[in-house]
C-alpha cells in the first residue's frame, strides 16, 4: 500500500511571482549599493592619492624655492662684497695668460713626450720581479676602506661647513640690509 503524499503548504502562483520580483529588485538594489560604495571608496582613494602627490610636489617646490632664495641672497651679498672690493689687475692678467697657455696646449695635437725604450724595459722588469699584486691587494683594500670612511667624514664636515657658511652669509646679508635701510621712526 502506497502512502499518500504529505500535504505541504504552497503559495499561490501569483504570490510566488510577485515575491520573486521583489527579491530580484531587492538584490539589484543591494548590488547597486555595493557598487556605489565600491565606487565611493575608489574615488576617495584616488583623491587621497592625488592629495599626497600634490603635497609632495608642494614640499619639493617649497624646498627648491627656499634653496633658490638662499642662492639669490648669497649672490646679492657676493655682488655687494665685490662692489666694495678692488680687484688686482696683475692677478687678472696672469689668469688670462695661464688660460691662454692651457688652451694652446690642449688644442695642439703634439704628443707631450716620447718614452725612452730603456725606461720602458726597466719598468717592465720592475713589474715582473718586484710587483706582487696579490700581496698588495689586502693592504690596498684596507686603505681603500679607510679612504672611503675619510671621504664620508669629509663630506659630512663639508656639508656642515657649507650650512654654517650659508647661515653666516644670510645673517651678514640681513645685517647689511638692516644697515642700508633708513632708520625706523619711533613715535614717543
UniProtKB/Swiss-Prot annotation:
Its main location: cytoplasm. The keyword tRNA processing does not apply. Keywords: Cell cycle, Cell division, Coiled coil, Cytoplasm, Cytoskeleton, Microtubule, Mitosis. It is found in: Cytoplasm, Cytoskeleton, Spindle. GO terms for cellular component: cytoplasm; HAUS complex; microtubule; spindle. Transmembrane segments: none annotated. One of its GO terms (biological process) is mitotic spindle-templated microtubule nucleation. The keyword rRNA-binding does not apply. Residues 141-163 form a coiled coil. As part of the augmin complex, plays a role in centrosome-independent generation of spindle microtubules. The complex is required for mitotic spindle assembly through its involvement in localizing gamma-tubulin to spindle microtubules. The name 'dim gamma-tubulin 4' derives from the decreased gamma-tubulin staining of the spindle pole seen following RNAi-mediated knockdown of dgt4 in S2 cells. Component of the augmin complex composed of dgt2, dgt3, dgt4, dgt5, dgt6, msd1, msd5 and wac. The complex interacts directly or indirectly with microtubules and is required for centrosome-independent generation of spindle microtubules. This is Augmin complex subunit dgt4. It comes from Drosophila melanogaster (Fruit fly). The gene is dgt4.
Amino acid at each position: 500500500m502506497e502512502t499518500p503524499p504529505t500535504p505541504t503548504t504552497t503559495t499561490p502562483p501569483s504570490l510566488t511571482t510577485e515575491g520573486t520580483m521583489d527579491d530580484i529588485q531587492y538584490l539589484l538594489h543591494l548590488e547597486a549599493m555595493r557598487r556605489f560604495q565600491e565606487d565611493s571608496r575608489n574615488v576617495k582613494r584616488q583623491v587621497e592619492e592625488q592629495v599626497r602627490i600634490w603635497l609632495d610636489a608642494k614640499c619639493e617646490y617649497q624646498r627648491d624655492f627656499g634653496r633658490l632664495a638662499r642662492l639669490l641672497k648669497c649672490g646679492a651679498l657676493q655682488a655687494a662684497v665685490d662692489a666694495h672690493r678692488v680687484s688686482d689687475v696683475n692677478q687678472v692678467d696672469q689668469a688670462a695668460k695661464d688660460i691662454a697657455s692651457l688652451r694652446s696646449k690642449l688644442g695642439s695635437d703634439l704628443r707631450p713626450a716620447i718614452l725612452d725604450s730603456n725606461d720602458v724595459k726597466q719598468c717592465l722588469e720592475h713589474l715582473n720581479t718586484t710587483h706582487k699584486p696579490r700581496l698588495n691587494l689586502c693592504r690596498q683594500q684596507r686603505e681603500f676602506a679607510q679612504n672611503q670612511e675619510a671621504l664620508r667624514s669629509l663630506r659630512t664636515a663639508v656639508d656642515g661647513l657649507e650650512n654654517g657658511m650659508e647661515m653666516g652669509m644670510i645673517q651678514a646679508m640681513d645685517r647689511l640690509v638692516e644697515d642700508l635701510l633708513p632708520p625706523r621712526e619711533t613715535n614717543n
